[in-house]
């Protein structure tokens, strides 16, 4: 017996030492799961519900990520929700961008450092009023591809992308020490016509393969059986979305038909609504949002406020809806934090509601950032687009008997110039037509350097032009943003069908894909010899409605050595019509004061300089207020308040657009700019 004790004591000692260690490891193991017996989430074994807000890192400069996240935390949110736009990270097949403003991993780690959990929505389709719903345009190189389906070509591209993205996300899962508690599969799939369950099952398998079996995967659809019929899938937790205009009881009953047990979740509770060019700015009354949020939280539900901050559609990233209506540069969304990240009345009202249910962090709330009105900056005309083709298209044009689309000439965004000659004399006006509505989306038309007018998708498909036989016919075609929602997201751009002149098909095209980004960035010091402007002068005798599309440039200096400068600002375009604007080579986005409702564009301070003059480059497409008679009118103005809700005036009636079954009703009586607290 003593010998036996001698042999077993070391073993008992080892077990005693290992036992507590193993128990401690189990107690501290991070877990996030669904407790179906208590209709709740469990976070590390304890009942939990999230109060989240949407922020899209792709719409907020990295410079401001921490500021916005801190404000969200101080509002009482314990989580954030964000989309991952595929096209933001893979602009060309196999070419990936994950640095600077594209560094989604840093963004998620920053949220984690600030104590915020994350609801991740990696698509591959996201909607989000984002260009093509986040799907990369290069998918359309196969013209017959059926997006968001089990089409083999689509699945192959998706599989490759998920194989890049999801392994980056796995270390950031809550179970692995990160902030990500749930991951959405696809997005509102029940609103899409395909209803392809093989596609959803494929995604489910790939998400599980890359992320493991422990993470909570979910879907989101409108709170109606019509949407849930094709959007829900066994093995993915079903959630719904709805706004202030919905009956909350009925909405959650819709979820309960798919998920009899488990937490109630509104994945998109709308704090505001989206805008379209040529339609009034959408707002939702603060009282309505606060009241509905109270009712949702009183039911013990988890909720995500969409949006908590909307941000900006910089460059060409805005989407569009059908019938075709493009979204503007501002994605303010009438959210609790303004486009510029400023605190609003709605922010404090919702914070007050949240603190009735959860503890709100103590301490000061980061203030709204200061804004500065830098004033008027005079611009000078550089060159018309036609005169700058050597800069804009250095590789030369493409010849084709019939027009080619943007995709066919390897151009995804921006502009393409289509050129041919008039096959007949048009001394008397002759109809230039797109009989199949094939101008996607706007074409700025000129004959021998004399502007003729604009062809516009759905609105203007015929334009009378004049010119002699053999004259040069130019159409500068703009991609205004691909459709992001519904059945028509395979949105080809350019001249997607033939044009006719007096019913005769035009042929023998010379096509110039324009690299405006490289041209602007590499010519900030100027564009060499400048135009004499004689084309504009000649046109002035015929009409005051249009000038040739042209680039304009100006500079302004910000004093150095002053601690508070530079500051955020807003750029306004008095007298200008429609175009694109860059500051120091940074593409701010589209302006269109002639159509509205947005009149100013947000200019974040980090793109401004005090060490050197700041360069403004404007591409005006329709009419510029510039003439030799009064050069002071050729100017833009920097102001310290945004104007995103002007009265709407436009030259062609727009049809009403409805994104979802029952969008929140816009409130018409709000001030045109958000209050700053």
UniProtKB/Swiss-Prot annotation:
It catalyses: Hydrolysis of terminal non-reducing beta-D-galactose residues in beta-D-galactosides. Detected in placenta (at protein level). Detected in fibroblasts and testis. Changing residue 318 to H: In GM1G1; uncertain significance. It is an enzyme of class 3 (hydrolase). Changing residue 82 to M: In GM1G3; mild phenotype. Disulfide bonds join 195-230, 626-634. Changing residue 332 to N: In GM1G1; decrease in galactosidase activity. Its EC number is 3.2.1.23. Residues 650-677 are annotated as: Disordered. Changing residue 554 to E: In GM1-gangliosidosis; unclassified clinical type. Changing residue 314 to L: In GM1G2; decrease in galactosidase activity. This is Beta-galactosidase. It comes from Homo sapiens (Human). The gene is GLB1.
